[in-house]
Amino acid sequence: MSSSSPAGTARTIRKKVYDASLKAMFTLRPERIHGIIADGLGVLQMATPVNRAMGRVIGVNDPVLSQEVFGVTFPRPLGLAAGFDKNATAADTWTALGFGYAELGTVTASPQAGNPTPRLFRLPADRAILNRMGFNNAGAADVADNLRRRKSRDVIGINIGKTKVVPAEQAVDDYRRSASLLGDLADYLVVNVSSPNTPGLRDLQAVESLRPILAAVQESTSVPVLVKIAPDLSDEDVDAVADLAVELGLAGIVATNTTISREGLVTPAHEVAEMGAGGISGPPVAERALEVLRRLHARVGDQLVLIGVGGISTPEQAWERIAAGATLLQGYTGFIYGGPDWIRDIHLGLAEQVKAHGLSNISEAVGSGLPWKDSAV
């Protein structure tokens, strides 16, 4: 896109405005900014004409990007990752910002406040975020009420997790309760057993613990069920979860959540140590998230839908995930640092690659191993 074209000029203006806004926002505590943005998007959700106008300006509506996945039509492959819209207060706004869909939550069966603040930190040198939010949310019943008030039919998934005070031996019933309350209000459900911020949660990724949870969720809803895994799993455990997902007939796997690793960071180690425990999202998780995705695709082929998430910053990286086996993509940290044009740039880049390779739809590129063609941009 030429910077002198009307579209290029508009993009330049949007970028300058967003960069200036980001600089101002970064003077505030991260969770305060999150609250301001979430409240603003909640208000915007009620302004349907504004939403539609935004969607026309920012959204990339190219038919080569539209796919039918587990019986649901996704107009664009990049969606909002779970963690931003925890209570579904802006569910009708995300596609207006350019996303193809949104994964809401994480939602727990009972409301909970999450971990003590501060619990959200920026690592600007890494364009990353560290969080230990702890599934703060209004609870499944309240979120269900919010979803019933939706006006649009934009595609949404709901990410469900374990209530912190519920002991591990009661986790099955806890997940079942959330699935029963929320399943019929979503296009798909994701079972989150991979957040590092709820004590003992990641232990539920072990197959013997995970099997009854997934089976209970499947029994509680008719919508597709996926499981979200951590990048910190061993390769053997990744294989075991993949095999279980195929055995149970799950719709897919979301790969991956945040990492507890602190390796390879640009941010000084003492600064990261002062932030404390938590999972890191953004570029530091990208390499391992891609490794896990490739391993999953090699293991399951097209038996499961794979959703690639973790450190996707550029159109090239997005294409790499598609070529490695991801049917859909998600992002959160890239959106924080890049704004709506990050979403638009990724979708434009993906559409250009589809055409450059002589394909008719992005689904043909999934798992293809096709390289990025520089001549396409």
From Swiss-Prot:
Active site: 195 (nucleophile)
Stretch forming the signal peptide: none
EC number: 1.3.5.2
Gene3D superfamilies membership: Aldolase class I
NCBIfam families according to UniProt: PRK05286.1-2, PRK05286.2-1, PRK05286.2-5, pyrD_sub2
Protein source organism: Corynebacterium efficiens (strain DSM 44549 / YS-314 / AJ 12310 / JCM 11189 / NBRC 100395)
Localization annotation: Cell membrane
Domain of life from the UniProt record: Bacteria
Major place of residence: membrane
Database matches in Pfam families: DHO_dh
Subunit note: Monomer.
Catalysis performed (reactions): (S)-dihydroorotate + a quinone = orotate + a quinol
Cofactor binding, per record: Binds 1 FMN per subunit.
BP GO annotations: 'de novo' pyrimidine nucleobase biosynthetic process; 'de novo' UMP biosynthetic process
One Gene Ontology MF term: dihydroorotate dehydrogenase (quinone) activity
Descriptive protein name: Dihydroorotate dehydrogenase (quinone)
Sorted UniProt keywords: Cell membrane, Flavoprotein, FMN, Membrane, Oxidoreductase, Pyrimidine biosynthesis
EC category: oxidoreductase
Ligand binding (FMN): 82-86, 106, 159, 192, 228, 256, 282, 311, 332-333
A cellular component annotation (GO) from this entry: plasma membrane
Protein residues bound to substrate: 86, 131-135, 192, 197, 257-258
